[in-house]
């Protein structure tokens, strides 16, 4: 009887552990409204991200600054200046 309880408890713990980490991410082709990919030039990296991108776009005369973005999942992430 004791081994049956242990076996059932282990089985339930395994089922619970397997069901918890549900990290499925569904990608969609939804566009961010008001975000333009027309002026994307510099490739973003660990050292060059949103702060640097925004500053460079403001210096270049883009009123809304800029942000790193990509129009598709396999596409490279670039600094996109916004008008």
Curated annotation (Swiss-Prot):
GO terms for biological process: defense response to fungus; killing of cells of another organism. Pfam families: Defensin (PF24552). Its main location: secreted. The keyword Secreted applies. Keywords: Antimicrobial, Disulfide bond, Fungicide, Plant defense, Secreted, Signal. GO terms for cellular component: extracellular region. Belongs to the DEFL family. This is Defensin-like protein 47.
